[in-house]
Design a protein with these regions (language model features):
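Classic N-terminal secretory signal peptides
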Residues: 1-5
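Post-signal peptide N-terminal regions of Sec-secreted extracellular proteins
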Residues: 6-113
Length: 113
């Protein structure tokens, strides 16, 4: 069957303090094996920065972290890996820095590609 990428997905989540992590509100479907996902129009509360990566929920593999996403640096391609197969369910995973003392709200949109 043909797997079509999903776009305009919600990246919203609350990331716990002190290196906490959280997944995006929406999940999407990979259209192309190993492709990068795209995060755009991101906002990160309190002027903080978070890290983000693409995560394959179907087989629990993740791409590399993209560092320092913020309300200013608010778009990024999130690396895929060869084991992220077309048709698999994927999400974005966000992580706070070790030194971020508060939980942080992240918002934005993303495409699974």
């Amino acid at each position: 069957t043909l797997a079509l990428a999903t776009s305009g997905l919600s990246a919203w989540c609350i990331v716990p303090a002190l290196n906490g992590s959280a997944n995006s509100e929406d999940t999407g479907v990979k259209e192309t094996t190993g492709s990068s996902a795209y995060l755009y129009s991101a906002t990160v509360g309190g002027g903080y920065e978070v890290d983000c990566r693409q995560r394959d929920l179907s087989n629990n593999v993740s791409g590399a972290w993209t560092r320092d996403i913020s309300s200013v640096n608010n778009a990024a391609y999130l690396e895929g890996v060869s084991r992220m197969f077309a048709g698999h369910e994927v999400c974005l995973q966000f992580s706070n820095n070790l030194t971020t003392p508060v939980r942080v709200e992240v918002n934005g949109s993303w495409d699974s590609n």
